[in-house]
Amino acid sequence: MDIDVLEFVDKIASIESAGDTLDRLPQLISLACEKGQETQVYERLNELASKSAIRVEQLSAENNQDFSKSVNQLSVVRSELRSLQSLMADLNTDIQASGRDLQNMKQQLNSLSTSERFLTKYHNLVRSCMQVLHQVQYSQELLSKKQYLPTLRICSEISEVHLKRLDGLGMYSTIQQYIVTTKEAICSAVMEDLHEWLFSIRQKLPLVGKSCSQQIDEARRRWAREYKEDLVNLSSKTSISLELYLLEMMDFSPLDNEIVKISFEPLYICLQVHSYLGLLSSFRSSFERDRRRQQEFLAPKSLTTLDMAVVSEWLNSIAGFMIVEYYILQCIPNFRSYEEVQNIWTIICEKLVETILSVAFTEQSTTTIIKLKNQIVLLMHTMERFGFSVESLRNLCVELIDAFGGALILKHSVFFEEAFEKDVYAPMIVETQEEYDHYIAPYWNFPSEPFPRTMSFSKMCPLCCTTLSKFVRHFFMFLNDSVILATEVNEKAPRFYRRFILRSLVDRLKSLYPKLALSQMSQLVKNFYAFEDPLLQIEKSLVLNKPIHQIGAEASSSNNVKSTELLEGLANARKSALHEIFVKINLKIDDFLGLAEYDWTTTQVRKDVSGYLQEMVTYLQTMYLESLAGLPKHDKSYVYLETLDHLCTAMVDLLSDPSIRKVTTAAAEGFKLDVEYLESFAAQVPDQSIVNADSFIELRQCANLLLGDNMEEYLDTDKFMRDFNRLQPAVAIKFLERHINNYSANPLSNDRPKRRAIEILIATLKKR
């Protein structure tokens, strides 16, 4: 039992005033009910009442009066006590009812307290959810405005701060999935924006390259105007001075100017997003693949001819593409490596070189090739300005020199054809000094003579020399002001010059041989001689690196510079022309021999020379004395010997014809007469007439063998070396086998000794 409640009961019991006791009684009841000690209090009160009754009895016994008084008081007390008990019973009933209500209220209070805690918790959760939802909504607003990085920061804040409060809720996984989806959406969006940006700059690449190339070209032209005095000085300038000039004078922003503006903001945003998400490495790889794919689209789908509109746009796109790469490399550290950019540049150059070379050598327009070269040189200067290696482009320009040379040869070959067609293949007659100065003086230096003057060559020669001079001048037009190619152009000029002469001039003239007459062929030989000096002068000017307009007197006064290849080409052309001349003459000789009608079985000695020989000799005299007039002595001698040797061989073959079964002495006498006639003609031909007459020694020895009295002389070594040294044993056997039939095999015949001698000679020759 709680001491405080009992003390309170005792304190009430000690109060003498009944009113005060009653005033304290509710407080006691409330305290007892609060402590749950109603029974104990009730028992304590009964105990106090009993004690009071006992004391009263004691007091009554001691003092009756007092007792009576006390009885009365006791009665009053009892009455009050009964009232009090009744009141306490009522109070107890009320207290019990109040206790039950209080218990219910306490239970309700506990329930309310629990509910309040849950409400507070749920309130906090709802507030957290609302904060998250607010952040989600805000992130969506930012995302709709393409503010990707702030959106990612909000997603990170949700994930790292707010989302922990939602752990265990179904909303947790939803928000978590939203964050993942949002990050993926942002990645997809920035990549889509990046691809759109790449596509947009792909459309602008030609403008970027063109604008920058124009600035480079203007700077290059300023340099050329400042430094170019003449072709010699230009050729001696190094390309280093031009490069330094471009580096110093070039002040131009290729990506931010009046023509084109390109912002790297989409790339920066994409880079920041992937860096924030820790995906920078994969983004770098993806960007590298995208740029490689884009460089593949720079080249035209097909290029079968040099369409300069297509090529120019391609080259400008290449320049623009690499300029963008350069600025990405410079403006975004540690994103693109120098090796990656150089690798792409190498691939682009390889594709460019392969494609251009596949069509350049089929291009016939020299103007187009020069335009192409100028575009590539401009691309070289542009790329050098941004630090890219241009060696492959320079090599491409060197290859274009060959393509240009081939096209130039094809172009100027037409002028050769015109000169060949218009030429009369006769000595050129110069009527006036003006004509001489125009056609002759630039290429030949002849002593002064009165006009009209007859040249040894035909008009073809000065026309061809003029074409060659134009060819050389036009060849150096490839150089223009491209000093970086001066050395290669100077080196290749003599080579293409010789190729032009040997292939377009010499070989084309050779193809005309079958169509030309003998007099025309003779004139052509003289033309080849006339070509030698001017062609070597022009070549010398190229070898000595002299300007073309100084070909004349200065070149001829210098030390003689000869090209073995050129001289051999002209010499071979002359030889082939001379060969064609004697081939034509030999064919005519064969035609005359086809008219020969020898009666090898005749017994009548012929007194006159065969008619076909007389006609043939007349033809040969005309050819030798007229058609071959003007040729050098050694060339004429060459033709004489070749044609006369052919005539001798043909007549030997005529006598060796298998259809001839018998050759009589009379027929041999007639044949010898023809041989003597030919020897007489050969002796009268000028220039080495003795040598010419020797061409018929074999024929004379054949006739002497057939008409010889003593056949054994052929077997005498001394006699053979003197009279039959040109006669082959096989040929002698053929003649003797035909001649033996002229003698009878009858032992009693007078011809028997002669026949026997021939038989012995034939048998001896066959044993050799």
Curated annotation (Swiss-Prot):
BP terms from Gene Ontology: exocytosis; Golgi to plasma membrane transport; intracellular protein transport; vesicle tethering involved in exocytosis
Residues forming coiled coils: 69-115
Gene3D superfamilies: Dsl1p vesicle tethering complex, Tip20p subunit, domain D (1.20.58.670), Exocyst complex subunit Sec15 C-terminal domain, N-terminal subdomain (1.10.357.30)
Keywords: Coiled coil, Exocytosis, Protein transport, Transport
Keyword Coiled coil: yes
Top-level taxon of origin: Eukaryota
Pfam families on file: EXOC6_Sec15_N (PF20651), Sec15_C (PF04091)
Gene Ontology CC: one annotated term: exocyst
Keyword set includes Heme: no
Role played: Component of the exocyst complex involved in the docking of exocytic vesicles with fusion sites on the plasma membrane.
Subunit description: The exocyst complex is composed of sec3, sec5, sec6, sec8, sec10, sec15, exo70 and exo84. Interacts with sec4.
PANTHER family xref list: EXOCYST COMPLEX COMPONENT 6, SEC15
Family: Belongs to the SEC15 family.
Protein's name according to its UniProt entry: Exocyst complex component sec15
Gene that encodes it: sec15
